[in-house]
Swiss-Prot record:
This is Ribosomal protein uS12 methylthiotransferase RimO. GO terms for biological process: tRNA modification. It catalyses: L-aspartate(89)-[ribosomal protein uS12]-hydrogen + (sulfur carrier)-SH + AH2 + 2 S-adenosyl-L-methionine = 3-methylsulfanyl-L-aspartate(89)-[ribosomal protein uS12]-hydrogen + (sulfur carrier)-H + 5'-deoxyadenosine + L-methionine + A + S-adenosyl-L-homocysteine + 2 H(+). Residues 1-27 are annotated as: Disordered. Residues 7-19 have a biased composition (Polar residues).
Length: 470
């Protein structure tokens, strides 16, 4: 998902105003594309730029150079990133490229970005703060005596002030046949647990009301360091998902905030966090990428291949935590997928009654081993299966949302306008899930603002969103 291009620092309401305050400061424009993990990389780069005294420009022509943080996972993302680089070159002329596309090579082994746009100043891969800053220093020397203490402890965020992403690790140890992330971001590297907790505390102190825990594989947190014991506030704390989630939940409770978990690979120890969700330590929301339900397709994907066990676990999770929302993603039309295998997936979706699902028609990704599998399906078959999948999934979602009519839900308000408010319940992550549309307040005592929690009585529902009143 692209941010405004170039992106202006979210702590500065008027980019031109920030520029006028320090006309002598070198100015950097910023374009951020891709997933929440890439957004965190962008936040780290912008934080470092500000710490070193650079101003962040809100326009191309107001910038001395532009940094483009790219996505390279699927073909559409590659093209979007290449187009953004081209636009920045046309509008500004001085461009540094970072992110996943920067790590991709073409069939001949040449850097894709430099091949298409040879005029870029520098190209780095993802999670490359040091390399990006070195390139910036080379082409736009940093100012003298920066006021580093002007940068807030929480860093600079590109999200609204009331929610933020907390990245706990980088890279992935899995080798799913459809994915090239390990080749771009490397194997799993877990952040020290005390560092993660300190960032979380700083975010809560800065007013964040919802913390979204992200990584390529949240469940694997700490595997690379053998679950080493760290220390937080003088107490031992294991570098392990369960212990981290419990500690984050306790910390969030002190600030009346939410913690939401994303990218939770279905390892057995995921079962340990369901009681924490039921006890209110973290939101009863589990983003677990299942990808398919037929064992043969899962084997070709190099994913866990026991759908019956997955169904049993889902039942057990809901028995422990009845309010649990389960989100997942799936791929339709994977190479070799038969009609019978696809029907198994549809049957699974109907039986599992997952609350939130996304489905992609399989798209070959350059460098993925799945490209070598036999049985590639025509585009029209892949798209037709994706549409059939979503028809079933949306019917399930509509039924589950209808059950919420008449209930009172805790809602975090994202936006207030003349038509009322727009917010999200515990079942809704920003950008990817549904919304709760809140009627305008009838009394002064019912007024609400963005970033506040309100209790909303649900009066209506469709297949994706809810409507209600305070």
């Amino acid at each position: 998902m692209p941010c405004q291009a170039p992106h202006s620092d979210s702590n500065v309401k008027n980019p031109s105003e920030a520029t006028n305050q320090k006309d002598h400061s070198p100015r950097v424009g910023f374009v951020s594309l891709g997933c929440p993990k890439a957004l965190v990389d962008s936040e780290q780069i912008i934080t470092q730029l500000r710490a070193e005294g650079y101003a962040i420009s809100g326009t191309y022509d107001g910038a001395d150079l532009v940094v483009v943080n790219t996505c390279g996972f699927i073909d559409e993302a590659v093209q979007e990133s290449l187009d953004a680089i081209g636009e920045a070159l046309t509008e500004n002329g001085k461009v540094i490229v970072t992110g996943c596309l920067g790590a991709k090579k073409d069939a001949a082994g040449h850097d894709i970005v430099s091949s298409v746009h040879p005029k870029v100043l520098a190209v780095t891969g993802p999670h490359a703060l040091g390399e990006v800053m070195q390139a910036v220093h080379t082409h736009l020397p940093k100012p003298h005596d920066p006021f580093t203490d002007l940068v807030p402890a929480a860093g600079i965020k590109l999200t609204p002030k009331h929610y933020a992403y907390l990245k706990i690790s980088e890279g992935c140890n899995h080798r799913c046949s459809f994915c090239i992330i390990p080749s771009m971001r490397g194997d799993l590297v877990s952040r020290p647990v005390a560092e993660v907790m300190l960032e979380a505390e700083n975010l809560f102190k800065a007013g964040v009301k919802e913390l979204l825990v992200i990584s390529q594989d949240t469940s694997a947190y700490g595997v690379d360091v053998k679950y080493r014991t760290g220390f937080w506030n003088g107490r031992p704390l294991k570098t392990r998902m369960t212990e981290l989630v419990a500690a984050l939940g306790e910390l969030a409770a002190q600030y009346g905030a939410w913690v939401r978990l994303h990218y939770v690979y279905p390892y057995p120890h995921v079962d340990e966090i369901i009681p924490l969700m039921n006890n209110g330590h973290v939101l009863p929301y589990l983003d677990v990428p299942l990808q398919h339900a037929h064992p043969d397709v899962l084997k070709r994907m190099k994913r866990p291949a026991n759908a019956e066990k997955t169904m049993d676990r889902i039942r057990a999770w809901r028995e422990i935590c009845p309010e649990l929302t389960i989100r997942s993603t799936f791929i339709a039309g994977f190479p070799g997928e038969t009609e019978a295998e696809f029907q198994t997936l549809l049957d699974f979706i109907a039986e599992a009654e997952l609350d939130r699902v996304g489905c992609f028609a399989y798209s070959p990704v350059e460098g993925a081993t799945a490209n070598d599998l036999p049985g590639a399906l025509p585009d029209e078959v892949r798209e037709e299966r994706r549409a059939r999948f979503m028809e079933v999934a949306e019917a399930v979602s509509a039924r589950r949302l209808q059950r919420k009519v008449g209930q009172t839900l805790r809602v975090l308000v994202d936006e207030v306008n003349q038509d009322g408010g727009i917010g999200r319940s515990s079942a809704d992550a920003p950008e990817i899930d549904g919304l709760v549309y809140i009627a305008p307040p009838q009394r002064t005592s019912q007024r609400y603002r963005a970033g506040e929690f309100v209790d909303v009585r649900i009066t209506g529902a469709d297949g994706h969103d809810l409507w209600g009143e305070v």
